[in-house]
Structures are given as C-alpha cells and as structure tokens.
C-alpha cells in the first residue's frame, strides 16, 4: 500500500509528518534527518551488492523513510522487496536510488539552513 504523497511545498520530505513525529522539536528534526542520511547511504550502498539480506535491508530503509516523511523512498523500498524475491531488482533498485538521491538533496538543503 503506497504511503501518502508529500505536500507539494515539502518536496521529497513531508515536513508536517516530520514535525508531528518529532513533536515539533527542531533540534530532534535535524538529528533524525542526519541519522537518516547516514543510514540511507549505508543501506543503499549495501543493496547495490544484493546480499542475501537485501530484502531485510530494503524493509529497514522503508521503515526509516516512513518515520521521517520520505514517503517516495518508502514506496520505492517497498517495491524493491518483492522485486528482490522475484529475482529482477534492477529497475526497482534504480528507482530507489533516484528517490534516495532526491531525499538526500532535500535533507541537505534543510540541514544547511541555520
């Protein structure tokens, strides 16, 4: 089941969802966004090699993305899980990479603000 799309002004990160999740604590928002950047980079790097635990890695990324409001990333990670099981993850992995890159750019922009 796809997650709700982010509001247009939020781009790849649903900032309202993030604010609700962090109870409006701006410092916590920045902290979880930074943690997501590190985790997403590590998981996407691992997924590129398609290790035996790739489906679990995609599921972990889906949950983390959902928590911060990166619903496109969550959707793409969710689509990767069955693609891995079906033995043809190439397209799904490329779409996940693109969604993560978009979220990363948005997060870096958010974190660059004072």
Q: How does the language model describe each region?
A:
Residues 1-10, 114:
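Intrinsically disordered or compositionally simple regulatory linkers and C-terminal tails
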Residues 13-60, 67, 89-111:
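Long, amphipathic alpha-helical coiled-coil segments characteristic
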């Amino acid at each position: 089941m796809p997650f709700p799309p982010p509001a247009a002004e939020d781009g790849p990160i649903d900032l309202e969802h993030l604010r609700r999740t962090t109870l409006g604590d701006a410092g916590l928002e920045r902290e979880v966004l930074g943690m997501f950047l590190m985790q997403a980079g590590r998981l996407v790097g691992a997924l590129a090699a398609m290790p035996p635990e790739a489906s679990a890695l995609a599921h972990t990324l889906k949950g983390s993305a959902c928590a911060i409001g990166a619903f496109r990333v969550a959707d793409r990670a969710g689509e990767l899980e069955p693609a891995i099981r079906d033995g043809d993850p190439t397209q799904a992995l490329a779409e996940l990479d693109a969604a993560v890159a978009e979220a990363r750019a948005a997060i870096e922009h958010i974190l660059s603000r004072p």
